[in-house]
Amino acid sequence: MDVILLERIEKLGHIGDVVAVKNGYARNFLLPRKKALRANEANRKIFEANRAQIEADNAARRTDAEKESEVVNGLTVTLIRQASNTGHLYGSVSARDLADAIVEAKPEAKVAKNQIVLDRPIKSIGISEVRVVLHPEVAVKIKVNVARSPEEAELQAEGVDVMNQMFERDGASFTEDYDPNAEPGLATEAEEAVADADDNAETNSEESL
């Protein structure tokens, strides 16, 4: 389907561009959200008659978004979640969770969940970078610190790899104890002596029977 864009659409085009898109994308997203018009003769005339106003409205929204970006850009939000010993969350962090966290941290920010761009789900503890699209032409990045406790979040904020630290600690607990001063072969000889003693005991027991 050919449509006339009413705003910039990433990887698609700018205001006034006529582009070909899949029917489902147009019907389910572009048209109902008033981001585009069907590219027929009647709509072309309507667009050209209102183009100046459409562009002025877009510029005003962009200016507001640029002001908001000064508040949101570079922000770090912390989310405390339950997770397994391997760091996997019991459930993922959603776009709504992030939008709510941003507004809680910066009440003056008006960020909606549909402005959060999650390239991949956040399913484990750690620090992730997430893009927030405040306007089709204005995007910023925030950091998301997901941890199991405020103390853990603070360590991560300081650059500590909490999971790696935990694995190293657990691995150390399974290290076999040894005497660095022992002579090579002594342990083996002692084990063989014990085994021989056990064999002799079994033999004597059988002979007595």
From Swiss-Prot:
Residues covered by region (Disordered): 169-209
GO terms for cellular component: ribonucleoprotein complex; ribosome
Domain of life: Bacteria
Acidic residues bias locations: 189-209
Keywords of this entry: Ribonucleoprotein, Ribosomal protein, RNA-binding, rRNA-binding
Gene3D superfamilies, per the entry: Ribosomal protein L9, C-terminal domain, Ribosomal protein L9, N-terminal domain
InterPro entries cross-referenced by the UniProt entry: Ribosomal_bL9, Ribosomal_bL9/RNase_H1_N, Ribosomal_bL9_bac/chp, Ribosomal_bL9_C, Ribosomal_bL9_C_sf, Ribosomal_bL9_N, Ribosomal_bL9_N_sf
Keyword Transport appears in the UniProt entry: no
GO biological process per UniProt: translation
Disulfide bonds: none
Any one GO molecular-function label of the UniProt entry: rRNA binding
SUPFAM superfamilies for the chain: L9 N-domain-like, Ribosomal protein L9 C-domain
UniProt keyword Oxidoreductase present: no
Alphabetical list of PANTHER family matching this protein: 50S RIBOSOMAL PROTEIN L9 (PTHR21368)
Function: Binds to the 23S rRNA.
Family: Belongs to the bacterial ribosomal protein bL9 family.
UniProt name for this protein: Large ribosomal subunit protein bL9
UniProt lineage: Bacteria, Pseudomonadati, Pseudomonadota, Alphaproteobacteria, Sphingomonadales
Gene encoding the protein: rplI
